[in-house]
């Protein structure tokens, strides 16, 4: 039997990825990894008694090249007698609307598409073509970003319904398999763009590390990840138990933690408990950095009253408020129709508002020495925290200082000859 098929069978069995009678949606981009995955699973489907459905998303990037990718996937699926689902998405528009990177927008749309297909065909599993090399690259990128133990463990082989049958297969083994079976997968030209950090890591940094430090740098990275993963699994279980003890109240939109009980935990558990609480509300931890959570925990330890606005996830984010006895996490309201952005402000602190290209800094200062002539000063006790900042919309009014009554913002803009954006 082909070496890749043997390794794939071992991996699937080791991690209990598939069971007889299941339907498996296979994400296929047309590149070497997913092409080899679909072809290999087709060879093993009868032995495993699984039904396969290929799924390909046209992201709306790369023009004619993407059209050829879709055509290739359809022809490959037909040759293997596998039903195929193709869908087109306007990822560039979604990226602009939600202010995301191209890769993040594509990832979100792609995962939503695969889950829709899985629901439509009553599939129990979604198989992705992530390889051993992808694991190494992801771990190193996480390391350079300043990740904690969770990021150093890399992505898991199984995160139901997602499974990764090529988890232990190298990119070189993929290429050898494609050549041995006469497969001619598509080559994504964007993989040559060194503006993307992953591409630069793959083509420049990893070869340099292998040449000057350790020819088996990938093995070393994965060995470390394996050790970290085992420790991480144990600590995550402990943190889940601690979260139940710390949690005072929970709903779909809010979680309240006992700050004093949280503070009594070991530091490693404190961070993990807070991460798990955020993940339960947000569904994931992408863009939630170490520094932000650590600042919240420092406020708990100091007994301070502070508030933090976690990065927004499209229309929703998490607002975190630390008080003397509680730490409360709540989902921010979705922006109102016609309101391009809205965000909770950190008081005190600095809040980046990417859609507007601005940052708002709030400080708590003693009243003495302030010059009210050239700035607005508010009494802290008179403010209803949290403070929500948003872009203006038609009909908004304000009370300008020195003016008796209110005035429409639109009229103020007209008076000052401020053009519409």
Show which residues each predicted segment covers.
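Core alpha/beta nucleotide-donor-binding catalytic domains of modification enzymes
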Residues: 1-28, 32-207, 237
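Short amphipathic alpha-helical segments with coiled-coil-like heptad repeat character
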Residues: 114, 213-216, 420-421
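Short, surface-exposed loop/turn segments at secondary-structure junctions
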Residues: 188-192, 215-218, 286-287
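Internal, active-site/partner-interface "lid" segment
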Residues: 191-196, 219-226
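AMP-forming adenylation/ATP pyrophosphatase catalytic core
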Residues: 4-32, 53, 57, 89-91, ...
């Amino acid at each position: 039997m082909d070496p890749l098929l043997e390794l794939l069978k071992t991996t699937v069995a080791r991690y209990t990825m598939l069971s007889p009678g299941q339907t498996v949606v296979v994400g296929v981009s047309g590149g070497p990894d997913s092409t080899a995955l679909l072809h290999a699973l087709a060879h093993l489907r009868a032995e495993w008694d699984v039904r396969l459905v290929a799924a390909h998303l046209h992201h709306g990037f790369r023009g004619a090249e993407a059209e050829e990718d879709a055509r290739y996937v359809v022809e490959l699926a037909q040759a293997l007698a596998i039903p195929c689902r193709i869908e087109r998405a306007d990822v560039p528009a979604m990226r602009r609307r939600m202010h995301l990177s191209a890769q993040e927008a594509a990832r979100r749309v792609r995962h939503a598409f695969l889950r829709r297909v899985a629901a439509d065909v009553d599939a129990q599993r979604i198989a992705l073509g992530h390889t051993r090399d992808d694991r190494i690259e992801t771990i190193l990128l996480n390391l350079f970003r300043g990740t904690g133990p969770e990021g150093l463990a890399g992505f898991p082989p199984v995160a139901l319904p997602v499974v990764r049958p090529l988890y232990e297969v190298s990119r070189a083994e993929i290429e050898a398999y494609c050549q041995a079976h006469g497969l001619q997968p598509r080559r994504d030209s964007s993989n040559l763009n060194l503006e993307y950090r992953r591409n630069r890591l793959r083509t420049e940094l990893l070869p340099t590390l292998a040449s000057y430090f350790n020819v088996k740098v990938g093995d070393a990275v994965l060995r470390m990840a394996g050790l970290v993963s085992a420790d991480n699994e144990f600590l995550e279980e402990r943190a889940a138990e601690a979260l139940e003890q710390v949690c005072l109240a929970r709903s779909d939109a809010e979680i309240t933690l006992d700050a004093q009980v949280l503070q009594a935990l070991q530091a490693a558990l404190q961070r993990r408990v807070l991460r798990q609480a955020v993940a339960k509300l947000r569904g994931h931890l992408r863009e939630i950095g170490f520094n932000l959570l650590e600042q919240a925990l420092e406020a708990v330890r100091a007994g301070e009253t502070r508030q933090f606005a976690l990065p927004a996830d499209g229309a929703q984010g998490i607002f975190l408020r630390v008080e003397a006895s509680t730490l409360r996490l709540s989902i921010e309201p979705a922006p109102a129709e016609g309101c391009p952005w809205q965000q909770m402000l950190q008081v005190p602190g600095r809040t980046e508002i990417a859609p507007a290209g601005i940052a708002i800094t709030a400080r708590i200062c003693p009243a003495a020495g302030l010059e009210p002539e050239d700035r607005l000063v508010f009494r802290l006790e008179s403010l209803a925290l949290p403070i929500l900042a948003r872009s203006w919309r038609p009909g908004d009014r304000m009370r300008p200082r020195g003016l008796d009554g209110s005035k429409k913002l639109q009229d103020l803009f007209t008076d000052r000859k401020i053009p519409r954006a």
